[in-house]
């Protein structure tokens, strides 16, 4: 269940509501508390851990997934997650978005790729499952720039990767930039993006689990691209195209690979 609330009591309530909803249909299911939105490691240590413990106290919850920025992960918190991972499932997901510093500066991320690599390595070194998020199609990035992200990520000790297409959202600075300078943006059609994703994963270390190809924004907020496809429909199209192309993850892997660090191994 994705958790957005900052108050510990609200965390338990949100988690309990989610478990109750799904347990009607799946009574034996276990759950991971997903601290998804915003930066879920930016607070005092005691305040953060109280929220995590509140979520874990909910019956049926067996672990945590915590999304955050690569420049907001202190060693003290990683030590907490390392100890917790000995008894619960723990994954840390970092929003990288790009491996190019010029892009990170342009989109005002406020961190460098070196900081992303450092956070990933510190996390994996503690035997914690480590994931990354990447946006494909950011302005100023060529097709080869995008595919080279796969080369760079393949050398990192990542467990999982979530890919997202660039989406223009109403009221954002990027939407204004695209309206003023459309020539600086390439908004992929669904077919173009499917082939881009497959080219990307053919250069990606096969030990990295790709958890997602696309993301979905509320229709009333989305300007473009509007493909009219749900995530599962898009994934089915990717799988079909993979079969047609006889493609496979890692077929064109370029750099020496680095195996992900997995707990218990």
Language model regions located:
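Alpha-helix N-cap and loop-to-helix initiation/capping positions
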Residues: 10, 47, 107-115, 141-148, ...
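Conserved C-terminal portion of the radical SAM core fold
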Residues: 114-174, 191-216
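Auxiliary Fe-S-binding modules of radical SAM enzymes
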Residues: 160, 168-265
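Single conserved hydrophobic/aromatic residue that forms the stacking wall/gate
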Residues: 1-8, 12
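Conserved SAM/AdoMet-binding glycine-rich loop
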Residues: 25-113, 118-119, 124-125
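Structural recognition of alpha->loop->beta junctions
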Residues: 56-61, 148-163, 235, 239-246
């Amino acid at each position: 269940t994705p958790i957005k609330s900052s108050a510990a009591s609200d965390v338990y309530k949100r988690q309990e509501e989610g478990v109750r909803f799904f347990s009607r249909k799946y009574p034996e299911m276990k759950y991971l508390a997903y601290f998804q939105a915003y930066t879920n490691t930016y607070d005092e240590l005691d305040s953060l851990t109280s929220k995590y413990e509140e979520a874990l106290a909910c019956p049926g919850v067996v672990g945590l997934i915590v999304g955050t920025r690569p420049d907001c992960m202190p060693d003290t918190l990683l030590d907490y997650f390392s100890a917790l991972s000995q008894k619960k499932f723990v994954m840390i997901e970092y929003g990288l978005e790009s491996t190019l510093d010029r892009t990170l500066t342009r989109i005002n991320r406020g961190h460098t790729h070196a900081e992303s690599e450092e956070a990933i390595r510190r996390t994996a070194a503690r035997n914690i499952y480590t994931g990354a998020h990447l946006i494909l199609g950011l302005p100023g990035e060529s097709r080869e720039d995008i595919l080279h992200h796969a080369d760079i990520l393949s050398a990192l000790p990542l467990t999982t990767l979530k890919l997202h297409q660039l989406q223009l959202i109403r009221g954002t600075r990027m939407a204004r930039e695209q309206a003023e300078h459309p020539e600086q943006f390439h908004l992929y059609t669904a077919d173009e993006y499917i082939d881009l994703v497959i080219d990307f994963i053919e250069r990606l270390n096969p030990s990295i689990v790709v958890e997602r190809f696309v993301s979905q924004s509320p229709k009333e907020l989305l300007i473009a691209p509007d493909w009219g496809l749900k995530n599962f429909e898009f994934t089915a199209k990717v799988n079909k195209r993979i079969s047609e192309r006889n493609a496979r993850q890692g077929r064109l892997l370029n750099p020496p690979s680095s195996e992900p660090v997995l707990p218990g191994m």
